[in-house]
């Protein structure tokens, strides 16, 4: 086999098993390439690295047991920030970085935020983004609250690597079982415990049995399940890994399919082990034989270094078409002047059929350093295209400046085909460099993205959209984890301005940003007139905008100092009809203030039609989600067709969890094969956008244990005050590129309703009101979550398994009067279940499907439960004596408040 092809095949197979950025791979049952990165804001602490090592070593043994001898941790890289002191044992990172780490160690955004969690917003079985541990969690022994740190790591690893979900539910800790008993939301039901309310007022604490809530007929809101310290149940790690007996995941044999938890909702009531054992990891990892325990993991200590970037830009003859050379230079100049961080090392290479080093690495400390590089941007296009020559010159520019290519970044832009690109794949792999690729126009080499994929770089596509090149370059910012260094796009717009007409607009500049603020305009024919006014009324005019020195039709204004907070207004006109663009970039106002951020990506970088693609956008400040924003995705196909999608954070359709700051939507509007680009715009909605001060889906805070007949309570979780659960957010704008993705097998256009059904309803709720059952849910669409479904099919049963396993034979509800609304709307429907004898205590289960005009039917929804209870006294009788007995067992117990953590 050709060596380069062998490398390509290995890397391609490796990429199929990984998320967009993770370097983790499984080799002979051992996980390799795991990266744990420490945030630059974390002060150096000699105890931190030993604690991480101890946690992972402990986790490896526990993981081996939990996976039934299939997997363990073989090697781990710990990446410390550049701000820490150098040590002989610290090695230089290769492609490891904070932004690509599997585990990050960072301070919480708020006080009392030490709960571990995994950022996970994909579908069942999809891998998560990262695990977040705080330094305080790693340095404080909270064994009673979370259990040993190694066990917590395995719980979070199952989220991250295998895409399973929690089996508890802090918002719905109890539910009514089909046996007419109240159960704690858990898996398995073999885990025993006691239900109590613990109240403290003015230093006086009272613990009592839980009372029934007259409205829900479940326990009152403050009721808590206290597990027995000594258990016989072995499952489950996704419920309470802190219990000594728990060493396995719930299986088909002991899975609690009734529990209203995220695992059942997202995975169609499949057990966690069922999801895990069908993962890609387990397809190639049979149980190890002849060993009692795996070898302990090995650790590499790495220290981040100064950023090294080399631009490798195409100046071949085809770059003369459609102003490509000018557009490239506009974007490259903006990148060098506004995006690259100070103290970075930057070089420049241009190539056609040969390559030319224009600048060896220059340390950027002032504007004069930028100008040394921008002065050498290419002015003429000619010759053929040799990408490999360009890359080799880029490597030479780096090594000749006494820097290693390993961990350095190459920004490669080309518009041409190159049949020889595969010849340097092996050299690229050996270099250790990270290659970001920008494909300009539909003829760019098809193998280009392989360079990004095999090196962990970003990939972009730019064509008709005038701002697309600037957007791509603006996205290639620091990966150190120091957000205050990153340049942020506030605006990126193109205007078709008629001669003599005025274009007016506004740019809100919020209080989290304002340093290093630039307003940039580009034009096609003649420089326009512009008037810019800050929130205090100060005006800037055309003469304040500095023209470029390269005749590339751009001008920029840098706001001195820190830009004013508030709404900036602009007006643009000209004597010529032409296309004009406006771009605004800035940086954080202060190193100690987290700026509002937006990031975006697709669920896959490569899709085979008709696979379902999902657009994801995350809006946050630090680790806290921003809710209620107006988030819009612009997707452009290879030949210019554009699709605009409003993204939703409503917990329906493609969205996993409501109000978590992750905005999503299915993308199905394919227009042919090839490359597609993604751009996302985020805007605050006045009086609607807010910052959530609570992190969702975090590790379970264990309230206490029943030990030797006594309830021993842990200190209560420090609560965020009700009035501080959310904070208002001022007006803001963010624009970000989500990179590119490629599609194959898609029709040029057409009716996708004949390919994609309506999306599954995931938020169906049911409630008895009088003799009627009232249903609510979010409407799916004609094509997944787009458009309007044709009709709903509602069925019910007294047994949830009837709906889960044999939906079509369950009792049909007459819903002929129900006309589906537009996707994303709130649906309501009520009906009288006349086919059943309605008696006090009866439980009915309801599920729903939607279909479209092509008779394609959605998956069966989540199963909702409605319980008929006439009065509290009657309901206690109807539910039997078990609950009263369980509730009252507390009165035979002694309650101890454990104020000192072990």
Curated annotation (Swiss-Prot):
Recorded topology in the membrane: Peripheral membrane protein
Gene3D superfamilies: von Willebrand factor, type A domain (3.40.50.410)
Metalloprotease domain: region residues: 45-199
Stretches of the chain forming a coiled coil according to its record: none
A UniProt-annotated Pfam family: VWA
Stretches assigned to the VWFA domain: 308-476
Keyword Zinc tagged: yes
Disulfide bonds: none
Main localization, broad class: membrane
UniProt EC number: 3.4.-.-
Expression across tissues: Highly expressed in skin and spleen, and at lower levels in kidney and liver. Also detected in lung and brain. Not detected in lung or brain. In lung, localizes to respiratory epithelia of the bronchi and trachea and the submucosal glands.
PTM statement from Swiss-Prot or TrEMBL: Glycosylated. The 130-kDa product is autoproteolytically processed by the metalloprotease domain and yields two subunits, a 90-kDa protein and a group of 32- to 38-kDa proteins. The cleavage is necessary for calcium-activated chloride channel (CaCC) activation activity.
Biological processes annotated in GO: chloride transport; proteolysis
Location of this chain's protein in the cell: Cell membrane
CDD domains to which the protein is assigned, alphabetical: vWFA
Glycosylation, residue list: 75, 504, 515, 630, 687, 697, 809, 814
Gene Ontology CC, one term: plasma membrane
Keyword field contains Hydrolase: yes
Active site (record annotation): 156
Single Gene Ontology MF annotation: metallopeptidase activity
InterPro entries reported for this sequence: CLCA_chordata (IPR004727), CLCA_N (IPR013642), CLCR (IPR051266), VWF_A (IPR002035), vWFA_dom_sf (IPR036465)
Site keyed Cleavage: positions: 698-699
Role noted for this protein: Plays a role in modulating chloride current across the plasma membrane in a calcium-dependent manner.
Subunit structure and binding partners: Part of a complex composed of complement component C3, CLCA1/CLCA3, A2ML1/OH and ALB/serum albumin.
Similarity field: Belongs to the CLCR family.
Protein's name according to its UniProt entry: Calcium-activated chloride channel regulator 3A-1
Organism this protein belongs to: Mus musculus
Source organism phylogeny: Eukaryota, Metazoa, Chordata, Craniata, Vertebrata
């Amino acid at each position: 086999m050709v060596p380069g092809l062998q490398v390509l095949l290995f890397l391609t197979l490796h990429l199929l098993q990984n998320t967009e950025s993770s370097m983790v791979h499984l080799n002979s049952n051992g996980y390799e390439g795991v990266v744990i990165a420490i945030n630059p804001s974390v002060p150096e602490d000699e105890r931190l690295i030993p604690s991480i090592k101890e946690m992972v070593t402990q986790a490896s043994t526990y993981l081996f047991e939990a996976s039934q001898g299939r997997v363990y941790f073989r090697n781990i890289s710990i990446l410390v920030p550049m701000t820490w002191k150098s040590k002989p044992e610290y090695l230089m990172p290769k492609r490891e970085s904070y932004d690509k780490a599997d585990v990050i160690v960072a301070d919480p955004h708020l006080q009392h935020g030490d709960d571990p969690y995994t950022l996970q917003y994909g579908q069942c079985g999809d891998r998560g983004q990262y695990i977040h541990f705080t330094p305080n969690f790693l340095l404080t022994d909270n064994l009673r609250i979370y259990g040993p740190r190694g066990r917590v790591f395995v719980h979070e690893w199952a989220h991250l690597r295998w895409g399973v979900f929690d089996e508890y539910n802090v918002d719905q800790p109890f539910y009514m079982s089909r046996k007419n008993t109240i159960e704690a939301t858990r898996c398995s039901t073999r885990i025993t415990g006691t239900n109590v309310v613990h109240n403290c007022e003015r230093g006086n604490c009272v613990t009592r049995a839980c009372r029934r809530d007259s409205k829900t007929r479940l326990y009152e809101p403050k009721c808590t399940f206290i597990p027995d310290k000594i258990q016989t149940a072995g499952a489950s790690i996704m419920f309470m890994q802190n219990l000594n007996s728990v060493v396995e995941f719930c299986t088909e044999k002991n899975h609690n399919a009734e529990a209203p938890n995220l695992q059942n909702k997202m995975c169609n009531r499949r057990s966690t082990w069922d999801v895990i054992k069908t993962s890609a990891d387990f397809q190639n990892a049979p149980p190890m034989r002849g060993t009692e325990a795996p070898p302990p993991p090995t650790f590499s200590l790495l220290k981040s270094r100064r950023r090294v970037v080399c631009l490798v830009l195409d100046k071949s003859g085809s770059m003369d078409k459609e102003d490509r050379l000018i557009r490239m230079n506009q974007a490259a100049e903006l990148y060098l002047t506004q995006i690259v961080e100070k103290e970075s090392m930057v070089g420049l290479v241009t190539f056609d059929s040969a390559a030319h080093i224009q600048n060896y690495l220059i340390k950027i400390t002032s504007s004069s350093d930028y100008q040394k590089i921008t002065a050498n941007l290419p002015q003429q296009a000619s010759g053929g295209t040799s990408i490999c020559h360009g890359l080799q010159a880029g490597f030479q520019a780096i090594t000749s400046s006494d820097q290693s290519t390993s961990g350095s970044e190459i920004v490669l832009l080309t518009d041409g085909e190159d049949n020889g690109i595969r010849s340097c794949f092996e050299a690229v792999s050996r270099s250790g460099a990270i290659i970001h690729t920008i494909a300009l126009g539909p003829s760019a080499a098809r193998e280009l993205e392989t360079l990004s994929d095999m090196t962990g770089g970003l990939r972009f596509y730019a064509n008709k959209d005038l701002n697309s090149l600037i957007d791509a370059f603006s996205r290639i910012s620091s990966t150190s984890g120091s957000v205050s260094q990153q340049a942020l796009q506030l605006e990126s717009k193109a205007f078709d301005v008629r001669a003599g007409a005025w274009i007016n607009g506004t740019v809100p500049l919020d209080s989290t940003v304002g340093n290093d603020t630039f307003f940039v305009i580009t034009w096609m024919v003649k420089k326009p007139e512009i008037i810019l006014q800050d929130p205090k009324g100060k005006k800037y005019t055309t003469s304040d905008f500095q023209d470029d020195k390269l005749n590339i039709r751009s001008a920029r204004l840098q706001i001195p100092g820190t830009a004013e907070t508030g709404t900036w207004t602009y007006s643009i006109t000209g004597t010529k009809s032409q296309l004009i663009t406006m771009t605004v970039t800035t940086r954080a106002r202060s190193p100690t203030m987290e700026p509002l951020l937006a990031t975006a990506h697709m669920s896959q970088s490569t899709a085979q039609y008709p696979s379902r693609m999902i657009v994801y956008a995350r809006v946050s400040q630090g680790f806290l989600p921003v809710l209620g924003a107006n988030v819009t995705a612009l997707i452009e196909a290879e030949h210019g067709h554009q699709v605009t999608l409003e993204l939703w954070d409503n917990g329906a359709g493609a969205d996993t969890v409501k109000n978590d700051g992750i905005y999503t939507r299915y993308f199905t509007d394919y227009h042919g094969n090839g490359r597609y680009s993604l751009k996302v715009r985020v805007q605050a909605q006045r009086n609607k956008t807010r910052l959530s001060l609570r992190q969702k889906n975090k590790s379970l805070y264990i309230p206490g244990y029943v030990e030797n007949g006594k309830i021993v309570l842990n200190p209560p979780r420090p609560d965020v005050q009700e009035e501080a659960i959310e904070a208002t957010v001022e007006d803001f704008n963010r624009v970000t590129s989500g990179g590119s993705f490629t599609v194959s097998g898609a029709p040029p256009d057409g009716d996708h309703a004949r390919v994609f059904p309506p999306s599954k309803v995931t938020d169906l709720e049911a409630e008895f009101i009088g003799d009627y059952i009232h249903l609510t849910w979010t409407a799916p669409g004609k094509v997944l979550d787009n458009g309007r479904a044709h009709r709903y099919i509602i069925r019910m049963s007294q047994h949830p398994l009837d709906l889960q396993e044999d939906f079509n034979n369950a009792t049909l509800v007459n819903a002929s009067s129900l006309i589906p609304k537009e996707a994303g709307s709130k649906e309501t429907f009520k009906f009288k279940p006349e086919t059943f004898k309605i008696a006090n205590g009866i439980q009915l289960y309801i599920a729903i499907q939607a279909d479209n005009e092509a008779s394609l039917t959605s998956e069966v929804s989540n199963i909702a439960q409605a319980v008929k209870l006439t009065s509290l006294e009657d309901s206690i009788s109807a539910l039997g004596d078990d609950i009263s007995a369980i509730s009252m067992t507390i009165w035979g117990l002694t309650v101890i408040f454990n104020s000192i953590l072990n």
